[in-house]
C-alpha cells in the first residue's frame, strides 16, 4: 500500500488559520508537544494529537461541513496506516468536546469564540445517552486528553519542536515524507 505524505499536507495548507491566533501547523505542533510531555513514550497518543485536525488540511478552506465532520474524515484518512486507537481518538476528539460541554459548564464557558462557533456547527453538547456511551469506550480518556490539548494548543507565543522533529514518527506509520522545510 502506498503511504500518505502528511508533511506535504502541512506544507500545502498548514500555514492557514482556522479562527484562532495560531496556524493549523502551529496548533498541531503544540498538540503534539503537549501530548509528548504528558504521555512520554506513548507514540500513538502523540500521533493522534499531531494529526487530530488533519482533515482540515485535506479539504478546501471555508467549508463548514469540513468542520462538522473533520474528526470522521481525518480518521478515515489515516485509518489504513495507523493502529485503530489512533484513528478512534482522531475520530472522537470532536465528540470529546461535545461530551465535556454536556457534563462541565465551566469547560463550556472557557471555550474560545471559534470553539463555541464550531461546537454549534458540530451539533452542540452531547445528549446524556450519547455521553454515557462515549464515556464507556476504553479509549475515551485518550480522546479527552487530546481534546484538552486541542483547547490548550492555541498559544501564539508557544515554542515547539518543528514538524521535522515528528518525521521519524510519521514515517513509521505513513512511509517516506517529503518535508522541504522545518
What are the language-model segments listed below?
Residues 1-182:
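Metal-dependent phosphohydrolase cores
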Amino acid at each position: 500500500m502506498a503511504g500518505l505524505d502528511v508533511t506535504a499536507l502541512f506544507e500545502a495548507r498548514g500555514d492557514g488559520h482556522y479562527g484562532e491566533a495560531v496556524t493549523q501547523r502551529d496548533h498541531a505542533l503544540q498538540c503534539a508537544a503537549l501530548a509528548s510531555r504528558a504521555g512520554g513514550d506513548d507514540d500513538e497518543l502523540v500521533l493522534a494529537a499531531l494529526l487530530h485536525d488533519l482533515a482540515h488540511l485535506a479539504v478546501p478552506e471555508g467549508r463548514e461541513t469540513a468542520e462538522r465532520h473533520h474528526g470522521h474524515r481525518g480518521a478515515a484518512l489515516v485509518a489504513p496506516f495507523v493502529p485503530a486507537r489512533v484513528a478512534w481518538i482522531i475520530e472522537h476528539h470532536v465528540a470529546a468536546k461535545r461530551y465535556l460541554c454536556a457534563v462541565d459548564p465551566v469547560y463550556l464557558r472557557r471555550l474560545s469564540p471559534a470553539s463555541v462557533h464550531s461546537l454549534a456547527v458540530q451539533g452542540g453538547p452531547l445528549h446524556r445517552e450519547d455521553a454515557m456511551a462515549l464515556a464507556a469506550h476504553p479509549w475515551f480518556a485518550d480522546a479527552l486528553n487530546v481534546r484538552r490539548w486541542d483547547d490548550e494548543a492555541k498559544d501564539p507565543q508557544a515554542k515547539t519542536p518543528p514538524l521535522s522533529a515528528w518525521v521519524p514518527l510519521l514515517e513509521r506509520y505513513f512511509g517516506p515524507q517529503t518535508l522541504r522545510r522545518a
